[in-house]
Regions:
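Conserved short hydrophobic interaction patches
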Residues: 24, 78-85, 120-131
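Short amphipathic alpha-helical segments
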Residues: 9, 13-17, 70-75, 116-123, ...
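Short, internal acidic amphipathic alpha-helical interface segments
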Residues: 62-103
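Charge-rich, low-complexity N-terminal segments
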Residues: 1-49, 84-94
């Protein structure tokens, strides 16, 4: 057992799920860069970072896009309102670099196929579009 009370078998199962998902994503998307935890690329007009955690196992989508008309106070209020209604993810504004981001975390309790991966990703993009359109106006 580890400090998280996971058996060796469960640790291996979770690692296999995370490894399988990462390999699937690399085959499905045109990856621009990657490191030990994340894959980065462009997707539907967003900068996309997908990060993986073997321990939990989790897959985290972070979508970011530049905002050309910054209005910090108004946009922070809108982001807070969006977050009150957003169940799966969170909306944020980084006024220092002038970008909007949407972040969503998904449990990987079973291996994904391409159809399920794109369903999850495209739902995140739809929510990011909703947030971006409200914040960019």
């Amino acid at each position: 057992m580890t400090q998280y009370n996971l058996t060796q078998t469960e640790q291996m199962r979770r690692k296999e799920i995370a490894d399988h998902t990462r390999a699937l994503v690399v085959n499905l998307l045109q990856v621009d860069a990657e490191d030990e935890t994340s894959i980065m690329c462009g997707y539907r007009d967003y900068y996309l970072q997908i990060s993986f955690s073997e321990l939990h196992p989790l897959m985290v989508f972070c979508l970011a896009k530049a905002i050309t008309k910054p209005n910090k106070a108004k946009q922070e209020k809108i982001a807070n309102e969006l977050n009150l209604r957003s169940i799966l993810g969170s909306h944020a504004i980084n006024d220092e670099v002038g970008c909007y981001s949407y972040r969503a975390t998904h449990w990987l309790d079973t291996e994904l196929n391409a159809e399920r991966f794109f369903e999850m990703l495209n739902r995140c993009v739809d929510e990011a579009n909703r947030g971006f359109l409200k914040l960019a106006c």
